[in-house]
Structure formats: structure tokens, C-alpha cells
């Protein structure tokens, strides 16, 4: 007896090079089999005829923190698109990351984060990030390193938005930063 059987869908599993019409059996929240489960019993049956059944997708560049102008809701955008993991690409800065964790921890999708080298993160209504290395240097580099030490499983990299509106004439100075 299974908890859920997803029947009659086109199952695409790139990792196992599987692409065929099949059923998916789920028990205790885990996929326990892919194949013919037409005669198997389950508490719930979902008919996926005409639909694709696939492992959760990864959005590798999202802005999920709703306190930034670009922020989006994971429930409204990720879940309907089969995204189960999203990488927030620098919405929070190193000085605001700990505040953003409150939101991130409530998301229904798994979130990993690139922390912005700008202390405040991405701009809100006309404020551009401060990425001047003269401002970031010394003590701030240590604070960024300590943030990564504290949240090793959550933070996966650093975001530096490189466009002329943000970096202006600091390109050479920025290329010399090592964090």
C-alpha cells in the first residue's frame, strides 16, 4: 500500500535517463518506484495523463527576498513552475542576510543564497548598491567570512552586480578584491 500513486504521466528523470509514460509510487514522502502501478493500492491517486512528472527543478537565479524591489513570492512563482529549489542571487547583503533568513526559513521551497557584497543588498527604489572596495575592505571582509562560517549550509557564494550603473569607474579596484 502506497500513500500516493501518480498515474499515466510522462515521467522525465534526466539523472536516470528515463523518459516514458509511467506511474510513480510514493510512500512516507519518498518516491519508492517508477513503473507500472496500475493495480497497486494507495491512499490517494493522481491522474497525470497529458502531464509531465519530473523531479523538482532548480531556479539558479531568483530574487526571493520580498523586501527588495525585485523580490518575488516563492509560492506564486516557484511552486507552480515545479521549482523546488531556488538560489537567491544576492537580494540580501552581508549586513541584512540574517534578517532575510526569517523569510527564507518560511519558504516552501529549498533556498540557497548568494550574499551581496553590498551591505544592504539589492536596491529599493533608486538606491544603488555600495560596492566601493574602499568601503568594503578590512573589517567588512572579516564580517563576510564570519557570515559564511555561521551559515555554511545556506550561503553558497557571493553576488557582485557588475553593470556601469553600480560599479561606475571602480572596475579595476573591484577586480583586486579577494574575499
Predicted regions mapped to residue ranges:
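Histidine-rich, glycine-flanked metal-binding segment
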Residues: 1-54
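Metal-associated gating/positioning segment near the N- to mid-region
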Residues: 37-40, 47-106
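Charged helix-capping and loop-helix junction motifs
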Residues: 72-73, 172-175
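Metal-cofactor-binding active-site regions of metalloenzymes
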Residues: 81-87, 91-92, 106-135, 159-166
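Short acidic, glycine/serine/threonine-rich loops at helix termini
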Residues: 98-100, 123-129, 170-172
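Active-site gating/metal-coordination segments in enzymes
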Residues: 129-173
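Conserved small/polar residues in nucleotide/adenosyl-binding loops
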Residues: 177-179
